[in-house]
Amino acid sequence: MTTTPAELQTKLFKSLKSDMTLMLGLSGVDEGHSQPMTAQFDGDDHRTIWFFTAKDTDLAQALGGRHEAIAHFSSKGHDLFATIHGDLSADNDPAMIDKLWNKWVAAWFEGGKTDPKLLLLRFDLDRAQIWLNENNLLAGVKMLLGSDPKKDYADMTAEVRLN
């Protein structure tokens, strides 16, 4: 079955909205250190991913103003993987904080939405490499029937523009 790049992109955002956790790091900083972050979206806008963090975290300290960043995502079922590139910046817009605020975020910030440690990160997406991991049982059956796994795999990966 052929999967188009647009279908892979749709699957990525559906999985990311469901699973919400990815590894985020700054390109060229701290030997590529990444840390788990909870991704949030402003409705159906898939051009930007938002993250709440504290100003005293290593990521926030290394960020400075705006920095190229990379995120790694693996769906809970390990049926989809992605590497996402973009620009990360601090954006403590009160309206966006209010829109994205929830009880899970509130648990981390005793001072609420105006906690002095609160930092909202904005990840403006540029591109992604997406891999779809076919069911191993199905892949095994296809190989037994003479299917070329490299040919089948070619339809399960794509590099897509996200901006």
Please state what every model-predicted region is:
Residues 14-29, 69-73:
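A short, Trp-centered hydrophobic/proline-enriched beta-strand micro-motif
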Residues 30-38:
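A positional/architectural concept
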Residues 37-42, 75-77:
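Short, charge-patterned binding micro-sites
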Residues 45-50:
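Short active-site oxyanion
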Residues 58-125:
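Short, structured beta-strand-loop surface elements
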Residues 116-163:
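C-terminal edge-of-domain segments
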